[in-house]
Amino acid sequence: MTATAQILPNTLEQNSDNISKKPLLGVNVDHVATLRQARGVSYPSPLAAALLCEKAGADGITIHLREDRRHIQDADVYEMAGQLTTRMNLEMAATTEMLEIACRVKPYWVCLVPEKRAELTTEGGLDVAGQLDLLKDYVAKLQAAGIKVSLFIDPEDKQINAAVTCGADAIELHTGSYAEAGLAGDIEKGSVELERIKTAVITAKRIDSKLLVNAGHGLTHDNVNAIAQIDGIYELNIGHALIADALFVGIEQAVIMMKIAMHR
């Protein structure tokens, strides 16, 4: 738990101004499922956690249905689709199986991400430029089913251009390198990575003013504010750090704390 977490007011009413500000906060509850799967039992429930996050002011819920089903399971996706009161953002790889699931569930958002079975977490952005034809067709099929599509990409011009060519409704900029620099205490690299993200937002809006620009990966109370202050960022998706704080303060308070950290 960070120093920030120890001094914040702890009620929704005290923080109503922060709750309603942009960028929006999407909460990833994958690691509630990670804890459940560690014992192969039926608890804790990602759905119950998601509903508490919504109650505390989360603007959306993100879940990643991986091909290896290491945390979120198919049943979680269907449960949430029927009970969330905000927007479901379903992260998934661009496979035939996942397309079929998404078209049945019809989440508000699908965010296409790269996957490697050996990785602990998503290690980088999707190479949209390198598989343009495949992804353009895939995006079109999702949109034909009434689903908005986001592409998780590195903050690079070629990937932004490719995402626009694909017809994506949004991009999510990978903030992992920025976050890792901060954890390593590398202030110079952190500044460089922050500027890359700022430039990417400007580039995206210049190419397509209607394109929504989200960001996420590795964001914590200590590093989120600089990203949240970037003009043009629509939503931040945060999971691991928020769920970690929830172990100490409860999940509703963790959501409130993250909103305050974003807008302090």
UniProtKB/Swiss-Prot annotation:
Chain positions recorded as 3-amino-2-oxopropyl phosphate binding sites: 28, 39, 218, 239-240
CC per GO annotation: cytosol
One Gene Ontology term from the biological process aspect of the record: pyridoxine biosynthetic process
E.C. number: 2.6.99.2
Keyword Hydrolase applies: no
Pathway, per record: Cofactor biosynthesis; pyridoxine 5'-phosphate biosynthesis; pyridoxine 5'-phosphate from D-erythrose 4-phosphate: step 5/5
Family: Belongs to the PNP synthase family.
Pfam families: PdxJ
The entry's keywords: Cytoplasm, Pyridoxine biosynthesis, Transferase
Species this protein is from: Psychrobacter arcticus (strain DSM 17307 / VKM B-2377 / 273-4)
Assembly description: Homooctamer; tetramer of dimers.
GO molecular function, one term: pyridoxine 5'-phosphate synthase activity
Gene from which this protein is expressed: pdxJ
The name this protein goes by in its record: Pyridoxine 5'-phosphate synthase
Chain sites annotated for binding 1-deoxy-D-xylulose 5-phosphate: 30-31, 66, 71, 121
Active site: 64 (proton acceptor), 91 (proton acceptor), 217 (proton donor)
Catalytic activity: 3-amino-2-oxopropyl phosphate + 1-deoxy-D-xylulose 5-phosphate = pyridoxine 5'-phosphate + phosphate + 2 H2O + H(+)
Subcellular location: Cytoplasm
Primary role: Catalyzes the complicated ring closure reaction between the two acyclic compounds 1-deoxy-D-xylulose-5-phosphate (DXP) and 3-amino-2-oxopropyl phosphate (1-amino-acetone-3-phosphate or AAP) to form pyridoxine 5'-phosphate (PNP) and inorganic phosphate.
Family annotation (InterPro entries): Aldolase_TIM, PyrdxlP_synth_PdxJ, Pyridoxine-5'_phos_synth
Residues marked Transition state stabilizer (site): 172
